Amino acid sequence: MGAKDLAEKNLLQYKDVFSDIVNVNLFGGRCYVSAEELSREPGELITKAVSDDKLRQLQMDVPMKCKKHNRSFFLCLENQSDKNNVMPVRDMGYQHAKYMEQIKEVKESNRKTGNYPNPMTKELNDSQKLSPVITLVLNYSQNEWGKPRCLNDMLEFPEDIGEKLTKLSLIHI
C-alpha cells in the first residue's frame, strides 16, 4: 500500500471529513450525517468462498456505521487512484460480506435468546431487518471514471433481457 493511499485513508478516518464527503455527494450538501453519529468499523471482512470453502479476506478502505433515529446504516469510502474496471463486482463482494456478517450476528442473537424463526429455514424472523450498506468510490485520478459504474455496464445481455434487470450502481465521486 502506497504512502498516498495511507494518507487518503488517514484523512477519511476523521469523522467530520467523512461526514462532509457523504453529505456533499450523497445528500446534495444537506447535513444529514453528522460526525457524532458515526463510529468506525473494521475494514477487514473475512468471508468463506462457496466455490472452494476457503476463507478470503476483503479489505474495505474506510467503513463507518451511522446511527440515526435508533436505526443504523453502513457507509464505506473506497479510494481509487487507478480506475478499476471490475469495481461494481468488488463492491458487491464488500456488500455481500457485510450483509452476511449482519445475518450471522442476528442468528447468534436469536440462538442466545431462543428467538428462532419458524420455520427454521427462514434464518431470520420476519421482523428482523438488515442495515443498508452504501459504498462511495472516490476517484482521485485526473480523468473521468470511464469504467463500469454498475454491474449492468459489465454484462453482455441477450436481446430484451437487460432492461428487466435491476441496476446495482456504484456511487462514484
Predicted features and spans:
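Accessory alpha/beta interaction modules
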Residues: 1-172
